[in-house]
Design a protein with these regions (language model features):
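Beta-alpha-beta core module
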Residues: 156-166, 170, 233-283
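Short helix-boundary/capping micro-motifs
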Residues: 12-29
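Conserved amphipathic alpha-helical core elements
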Residues: 41-42, 115
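Secondary-structure junction motif
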Residues: 149, 176, 182-185, 189, ...
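Hydrophobic hinge/microswitch elements
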Residues: 130-143, 149, 205-262
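Central regulatory/effector-binding core of bacterial HTH transcription factors
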Residues: 92-155, 229
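A short LG(V/I)-centered, amphipathic sequence patch enriched
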Residues: 20, 42-64
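Acidic, Gly/Pro-rich loop/turn segments at junctions of secondary structure
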Residues: 118, 129-196, 252-257
Length: 310
């Protein structure tokens, strides 16, 4: 029996995800089928690749060594397929792009249109992701690349296997109801002046919620959170009704331009970055480079245009 690419892909997934159940969920198998594939691979190489650890399994030393080579082999296979598809200088490969809620509305239509114009045979699909699982989704191979949000004060996980490309950096300001805005005698405030304000922000376990709390704590206070809301449109609607203030960016406002709000600039450096996350090894793939360029152009042109529009 010889090693198959399917067996190697299963071993690589087990090395990355850690459990048979997780591998089964990502690859679309049953846990029993995953176990059978690992057993078949052990027979092929004549070595034990996994060992029991309670209810779970861990890779043996031989398993870890083979997992490293499996990743190289599978990457080489992808590169070979990419090269074959590029023989006629035309992209005709599948590509899954991860997006989060607001990018799906603001960027995805323009990205799809640009891809269709430049590469008619590129099979570009999208998958909505929560912003807190973007890096994991790319690492697991659930998507080929993903648009996400990174907060310098509470950065997303980094690793040697992923690359984070900054597409746009934008500063946070404050949004409040027009009635409350009339009581604020300034067009800019320091964070430390907001200790007595009430806020509408996402929960602490979200990247945005963690970043807001970190910025406030860095300025010496714990934010008074009246409402924990994850949806930007809902947040702005509540702000307009006077239920609290919210931290907003130009992009967030551009997606909800009808909300009757007053905005105040924050003097302190509190910002976020719209980023593209992709596997480091995938840079050699022409599709990855092409989609990266498309997303960068759309962010520069279409998103900038939406923000600049009245």
């Amino acid at each position: 029996m010889v090693m198959s690419l399917t067996h190697l892909a299963t071993l690589r997934a087990l090395d990355r995800l850690g459990t048979m159940v997780s591998v089964a969920q990502v690859l679309g198998y049953t846990p029993g089928a995953v176990s059978q594939q690992i057993a078949a691979l052990e027979t092929a190489v004549g070595e034990r690749l996994v060992a029991r650890a309670g209810r779970n399994v861990v890779l043996t030393d031989a398993g870890r060594v083979l997992a490293v080579h499996a990743d190289r082999i599978l990457t080489a296979e992808q590169d070979a397929l990419e090269a074959l598809r590029s023989v006629n200088d035309e992209l005709s490969a599948p590509f899954a792009l991860g997006v989060f809620g607001s990018t799906a509305a603001a960027l995805l239509p323009a990205v799809m249109a640009a891809a269709q114009r430049r590469y008619p045979r590129l099979e570009l699909t999208s998958r909505e992701l929560s912003v807190d699982v973007v890096v994991d989704a790319v690492r697991r191979g659930s998507v080929d690349a993903a648009i996400g949000l990174d907060y310098p004060i509470a950065p997303m996980p980094r690793g040697g296997d992923t690359e984070i490309i900054t597409l746009r950096r934008e500063s946070f300001g404050l949004a409040m109801s027009r009635d409350f805005g009339e009581t604020v005698d300034a067009d800019a405030v320091h964070l430390q002046e907001l200790a007595d304000w009430t806020f509408i922000i996402p929960p602490a376990h979200t990247p945005f919620g963690a970043a807001v709390r970190a910025a406030c704590r860095q300025s010496g206070f714990e934010p008074n959170v009246r409402h924990e809301i994850m949806d930007s449109a809902v947040t702005l609607a509540l702000v307009a009704r006077g239920l609290g203030a919210a931290f907003v960016t130009d992009t967030m406002i551009a997606l909800n331009p009808a909300a009757p709000l007053t905005r105040v600039r924050i003097v302190d450096d509190f910002s976020r970055e719209i980023v593209l996350v992709r596997p480091v090894a995938s840079v050699a793939r022409r599709t990855v480079r092409a989609v990266t360029a498309i997303v960068q152009d759309v962010v520069d042109d279409d998103l900038e245009g939406a923000i600049a529009s009245p």
